[in-house]
């Protein structure tokens, strides 16, 4: 079993695949270095002399600079490494020399639902979308009181509560409206009840304008202040929606119709070595099959965005990517925050030292395929292949944004573990075997087998594709079995 991995030949550090005790001789890629101190799993050890101020190289890329001289065998982490990041950057388009669509492969099929507008779905659920936080508890009670309607091909009745829809202004208010309307359009929702109070800022008329054309059999509205008994009224509407949703049955659908979100959270030092490269290989496989994948977490691209921007399929897509990256940096700066105020305490405990370190691991989820489009918050995926989506690193907010973009399911890699799920089925992928064994009630797929030397990234990616097809065909994720699903809306404005 290998002790460490030397990711790039030019790296001056290796990453411990397992804990390395002080005094252990570590041999990797022709290098032989004795650990001068204990090196925890996922953490970095110098394999070459690194001078004070010299860049620390991992993934073949600077992830910060040393703040003290370090000899081979030294533990390299937050105590002796600091970020190189600052503010906005002027980028230039330098397309990768091998930039071209990957060779096509005949897509497999899954057993999904075909909606009347032609879109594919992997779940056949009824959703209740509150337009304002004031009706959250009403929505929850409606769900609890009407579970008897979940019969036949209907797979669930759910609501997604939130605190917004009122006391917001301007862009913030518009973002909430746009996000909620996008959820109403999601294909996994066979039918939707939009539930409002009646006096909120997000008016019925505004919501209708945002929603645009819709199927009146699929989407119904209820304003609680307009009826005497909102529970009886909701029951009547849900009976109609259940009759509509119950018409759909699973049928063979090509994988090319799938949209898959890609996310990481609770990352550790193995995220960029096991789980994220596996997801990246999966993303390439999806692109070859004519499917779509979505990459977000813009702040966790900072410091590694060049890897992605050079893969934009053309100059127009590059310009959109540039505006997205610098726009998010401006968002930080406008709030008097530094762009490198990341990683989290859990990330650091797992071996991630700087934002560049985290970002270089994060972007591994994007694989090697060209970036075909860059889309805004609340906008749908319309282009096949790899898409970049405007959204923050926050797990709940970014996973909600990917769901709103049309992701049928989300691949979520984690080195520390997390139980949450978006409205779209959320597959948890562990970076290490101890986590998969400890939190078997959370983890759906273990890429720790790569660090253990049991499987290659290619083999793990093929296994992951097989699992995605099974989940798309109805197999429940661990989070679904627990009943976990929620949303969080991106907010950046004042509260009235």
Regions found by a protein language model. Give the residues of each.
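Metallocofactor- and cofactor-centric catalytic cores in central/energy metabolism, strongly enriched
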Residues: 1-409, 416-496
């Amino acid at each position: 079993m290998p002790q460490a991995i030397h990711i790039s030949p030019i790296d001056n550090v290796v990453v411990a695949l397992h804990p390395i005790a002080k005094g252990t001789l570590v041999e990797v890629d022709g290098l032989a270095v004795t650990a001068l101190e204990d090196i925890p799993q996922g953490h970095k050890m110098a394999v070459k002399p690194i001078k004070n101020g010299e860049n620390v190289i991992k993934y073949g890329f600077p992830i910060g600079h040393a703040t003290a001289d370090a000899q081979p065998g030294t533990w390299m982490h937050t105590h002796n490494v600091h970020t190189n990041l600052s503010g906005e950057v002027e980028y230039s388009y330098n397309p990768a020399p091998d930039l071209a669509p990957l060779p096509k492969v005949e897509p497999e099929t899954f057993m999904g639902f075909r909606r009347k507008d032609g879109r594919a779905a992997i779940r056949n659920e009824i959703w209740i979308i509150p337009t304002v936080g004031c009706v959250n508890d009403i929505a929850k009670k409606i769900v609890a009181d009407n579970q008897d309607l979940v019969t036949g091909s209907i797979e669930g009745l759910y609501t997604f509560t939130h605190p917004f829809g009122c006391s917001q202004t301007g862009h913030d208010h518009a973002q909430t409206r746009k996000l909620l309307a996008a959820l109403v359009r999601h294909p996994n929702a066979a039918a939707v009840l939009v539930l409002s109070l009646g006096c909120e800022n997000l008016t019925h008329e505004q919501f209708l304008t945002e929603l645009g054309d819709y199927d009146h059999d699929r989407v119904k509205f209820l304003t609680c202040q307009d009826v005497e008994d909102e529970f009886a009224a909701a029951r009547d509407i849900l009976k109609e929606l259940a009759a509509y949703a119950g018409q759909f049955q699973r049928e063979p659908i090509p994988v090319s119709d799938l949209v898959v979100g890609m996310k990481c959270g609770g990352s550790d030092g193995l995220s960029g070595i096991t789980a994220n490269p596996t997801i990246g290989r999966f993303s390439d496989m999806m692109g070859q099959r004519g499917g779509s994948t979505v990459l977000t977490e813009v702040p966790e691209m900072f410091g590694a965005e060049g890897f992605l921007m050079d893969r934009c399929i053309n100059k127009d897509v590059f310009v959109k990517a540039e505006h997205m990256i610098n726009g998010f940096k401006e968002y930080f700066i406008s709030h008097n925050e530094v762009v490198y105020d990341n990683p989290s305490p859990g990330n650091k405990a797992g071996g991630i030292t700087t934002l560049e370190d985290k970002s270089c691991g994060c972007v591994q989820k994007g694989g090697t395929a060209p970036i075909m489009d860059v889309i805004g918050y609340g906008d749908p995926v319309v282009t096949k292949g790899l898409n970049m989506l405007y959204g923050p690193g926050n797990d709940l907010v970014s996973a909600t944004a990917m769901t709103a973009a049309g992701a049928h399911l989300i691949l979520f890699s984690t080195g520390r573990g997390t139980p949450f799920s978006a409205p779209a089925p959320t597959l948890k992928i562990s970076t290490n075997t101890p986590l998969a064994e400890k939190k078997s009630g959370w983890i759906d797929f273990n890429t720790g087998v790569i660090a253990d030397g049991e499987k290659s990234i290619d083999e793990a990616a093929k296994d992951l594709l097989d699992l995605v097809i099974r989940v798309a065909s109805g197999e429940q994720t661990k989070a679904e079995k627990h009943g976990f699903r929620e949303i969080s809306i991106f907010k950046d404005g004042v509260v009235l």
